[in-house]
Amino acid sequence: MLKVQQTADGTGKCLTTTMPIRRDTAFHLIRQYRPATEKTYTSVQIGINDSIEEFYLAHLNHSCEPNVIVDTKKLELRAIRDIAPGEDLTFFYPSTEWHMAQPFQCSCGSPRCIGKVSGARDLPLNLLGGYFVNQHIGAMAMEHLIGAQKLKTPIAV
């Protein structure tokens, strides 16, 4: 069902499907993974301090108009719209990554393109709120917001 192949522009690899996938379908269970000892270009953050490496996740590219959710609680890939055979499978990297090991300039071409992809930490909450984000990212965003609000509060002497 899942296939790793060369990207259309020939610059890398991508993950595609050989069969149609219907919206809201969990189509891959993430079970054959190993804990990542450090963040890498191919690791996926699944908790506040935990990242993993997995073959298919390593080939799942970013898009600001994704067709897949990486659900780090259920450890599954789920379609967020109908996906046709041969279509590149993509997810929104800040949905799992707070701070990325290797930020990059997005070239997805979407009207929703965020430009530099460096992790959820660097995105405004109103923009992040337009996407599915995993529980650990939501928790870290709230902690970040609360910390920023505390800095704005005058200190009584």
Positions of predicted regions on the chain:
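Conserved catalytic SET/PR domain of SAM-dependent protein methyltransferases, capturing the structural core
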Residues: M1-V157
